[in-house]
Each structure stands twice: as C-alpha cells, then as structure tokens.
C-alpha cells in the first residue's frame, strides 16, 4: 500500500473504529431494533469499505435518515460501485471460480 493510499484510508479507519465501538459497546444494550437489513451500523461499515470516506459517509447518513417510524424498513443493501457493476456479469459467467488461474 502506498503512503498516499494509507493517508486516504485514515478517515475511513477512524469511522470504522467508531462503528466497531458502537457495535461492541452500545448496540448490545439497545438490542436488535433496526428496521433494516443489514443493520444501519453494518450498512455504514460496508459503505465505507466499498465506497470510501465521502461516498460511504453520504450513503450512511442517508440510510440513518431513513431509519425511523416514518419508513417501513426492509432489505436495503449498499449500492455497488461502478467497478462491481462492470465485473459482476463476468463473475456470473465464471461462477466465481478462479481455479483456472492457478497452475
């Protein structure tokens, strides 16, 4: 990992640390009360990991804004990145098996 990439990951890692602390310390006290799948904290974790700091935070804020009695909830997965959208058809054809690449 380059130093520049490492520096870009610092805000993501700080946010992930806050999310993990919430999941370990606060969430068990509240119980399972999220009206979405995945839960809002897991959604935020996935969004930050796949979309980076700015877009991950934006997606997380939008999701938390929907989490209330005014929204029915349900399944709400993190949107795919552009790269995931491009690679998905090839993964379906390949079946996700990369054994043909090994010697």
Swiss-Prot record:
It is a peripheral membrane protein. Its main location: membrane. It is found in: Cell inner membrane. Pfam families: YidD. GO terms for cellular component: plasma membrane. Keywords: Cell inner membrane, Cell membrane, Membrane. It comes from the Bacteria. Could be involved in insertion of integral membrane proteins into the membrane. Belongs to the UPF0161 family. This is Putative membrane protein insertion efficiency factor. It comes from Chlamydia pneumoniae (Chlamydophila pneumoniae).
